[in-house]
Amino acid sequence: MAGKTLDRVLYVEDEPDIREVARFALEYSGDYEVKICESGAEALSIVGTFKPDIILLDVMMPGMDGLATMEALRQREETADVPIVFMTAKVQSAEVSRYLALGAASVIPKPFDPRTLGATVKEIWEEHAG
């Protein structure tokens, strides 16, 4: 990924208020193109046309949860190597260790600070870009 920049963020979140705060924070902080999906199924349906540089993924969603969504994204050629970051209120050390062991690049606790979300996402992406 040498020379690649962070331009496109996919955020999968079922809560409308959280989606909008995150969208605003990311667009404001980095002028990123942010695509929002309400479910794992929706995310899987758009990754063929929207090629994200990083994926932010809620863990607890109805239907396909974040873990199942990550597993499905990893099986797709377009997203097999894209860093996936879980955003969740479940941040006990055992849970975080489990998410990382299953392949998450990082975990951002909810509630998150909108003022620092963009910088946090960029930092995580840079750690995994090289």
Which sequence ranges carry the predicted segments?
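Non-catalytic signal-transmission and effector/linker regions of two-component phosphorelay proteins
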Residues: M1-L10, R115-G130
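Alpha4 helix (beta4-alpha4-beta5 surface) of REC/receiver domains from two-component response regulators
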Residues: R23, A68, V91-I108, A119-E123
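Helix N-cap/capping motif at the beta->alpha junctions
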Residues: I36-S45, G66-A68
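Active-site beta3 strand of CheY-like receiver
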Residues: F50-L56
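Receiver (REC) domain active-site loop signature in two-component systems and cognate sites
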Residues: M61
